[in-house]
Amino acid sequence: MASERQYSPVDRLLLQADAALRTLLPFSGASSRPSPAIVQAETDLNPEESRHIAGLMRINHTGEVCAQALYQGQALTAKLPEVRSAMEHAADEEIDHLAWCEQRIRELGSHPSVLNPLFYGLSFGVGAVAGLVSDRVSLGFVAATEDQVCKHLDEHLEQIPEHDAKSRAILEQMRIDEEQHANSALAAGGVRFPAPVKFGMTLLSKVMTKSTYRI
């Protein structure tokens, strides 16, 4: 069996810079899977519906920016090669979500949040620190983060009208993927975070959702 390619520190920094650019630059993230919205018919939305749904999709897009940064930060400092590989694979799947959300936001006549670079930097730092503590903590942070994302997706699916089949199809597939990421992280040995830690993460996520809904 071929051994895993060994990257130098400079190589890894260049890979991280490439990942950041692909995450933050418009239309730079190419999905490996077609958007679930492609097979859904477009329906007429009134201006208020379009504005609200675009705001929700902007939140989800920024959430994927944060997840991408979190995974990249953890991959940079993960101690075990298999954990690093798992983080990089999960980050690749998040690129799909980024591309799907951005495409839908544009279709609704809006744009991604201008705060994305800020949230990327913060999330990357958190991921790198978690990876330095231990791989089990790093994996646990993934599981807890994905749980938060799933809650946001459930809330948004309740708000998006049934006739917006395109947006709903995207969020439903994202929900499946995120739950799988959380379960995989726990199965790989991630620690289950206590309720107080999860509560703190919920408060921080509210800052993101409130700010990116409009800008």
From Swiss-Prot:
Listed SUPFAM superfamilies: Ferritin-like (SSF47240)
Species name: Ectopseudomonas mendocina (strain ymp)
Gene this chain is encoded by: coq7
PANTHER family the record matches: 5-DEMETHOXYUBIQUINONE HYDROXYLASE, MITOCHONDRIAL, COENZYME Q10 BIOSYNTHESIS PROTEIN 7
Pathway: Cofactor biosynthesis; ubiquinone biosynthesis
Protein name: 3-demethoxyubiquinol 3-hydroxylase
Chief location bin: membrane
One Gene Ontology term of the molecular function aspect: metal ion binding
HAMAP family: COQ7
